[in-house]
Amino acid sequence: MAKKIVGYIKLQIPAGGANPAPPVGPALGQKGVNIMEFCKQFNAKTQPQAGMIIPVVITVFSDKSFTFVTKTPPASILLIKEAKLQKGSSEPNRNKVGKVTKEQVRKIAELKMPDLNANTVEAAERMVEGTARSMGITIEG
């Protein structure tokens, strides 16, 4: 018989940087999950992506065991990295803070493809371009 699912926990944690402090500890503690075990597994799995923020969906079962699935980093984080910025614009309509090329947008779209509900890379590119516009980043090319 399959284990009964108690709940899902969605978090965004820096790769290789999960620790029992908030937000990880309280979120997992409420469901009775072994926090240190999750931290060890997550850090081991995300070590190669150090410096990125990784969304993770943790499935908690009735016997307090868990599984987790890591997603690709948010498009906004990838855009900031490509444009070599600290953060997006506070007024995206007025001040533009950076530029990315069509090739960079395509690279991000291809990386994000498994997590987006887009059927084609072109549709994924348009989603990434929309994120860039809302952050005050212009697309060249």
From Swiss-Prot:
Report the sequence similarity comment from the record.
Belongs to the universal ribosomal protein uL11 family.
Annotated Gene Ontology MF terms? large ribosomal subunit rRNA binding; structural constituent of ribosome
Name the record gives this protein = Large ribosomal subunit protein uL11
Which PROSITE patterns does this entry report, sorted A to Z? RIBOSOMAL_L11
**What does the UniProt record say this protein does?**
Forms part of the ribosomal stalk which helps the ribosome interact with GTP-bound translation factors.
Q: Would I find Ribosomal protein among this entry's keywords?
A: yes
Q: How is it modified after translation?
A: One or more lysine residues are methylated.
In terms of superkingdom, the source organism counts as Bacteria
For this protein, the record's SUPFAM superfamilies field holds: Ribosomal L11/L12e N-terminal domain (SSF54747), Ribosomal protein L11, C-terminal domain (SSF46906)
Q: State the GO CC annotations.
A: cytosolic large ribosomal subunit
Q: Which organism is it from?
A: Chloroherpeton thalassium (strain ATCC 35110 / GB-78)
Could you state one GO biological process linked to this protein?
A: translation
Summary of subunit composition and partner proteins: Part of the ribosomal stalk of the 50S ribosomal subunit. Interacts with L10 and the large rRNA to form the base of the stalk. L10 forms an elongated spine to which L12 dimers bind in a sequential fashion forming a multimeric L10(L12)X complex.
High-level lineage: Bacteria, Pseudomonadati, Chlorobiota, Chlorobiia, Chlorobiales
Does the record's keyword annotation contain RNA-binding?
yes
List where the protein spans the membrane.
Answer: none
Sorted keywords for this record are:
Methylation, Ribonucleoprotein, Ribosomal protein, RNA-binding, rRNA-binding
Q: CDD domains in the record, alphabetically?
A: Ribosomal_L11
Entry-linked InterPro entries: Ribosomal_uL11, Ribosomal_uL11_bac-typ, Ribosomal_uL11_C, Ribosomal_uL11_C_sf, Ribosomal_uL11_CS, Ribosomal_uL11_N, Ribosomal_uL11_N_sf
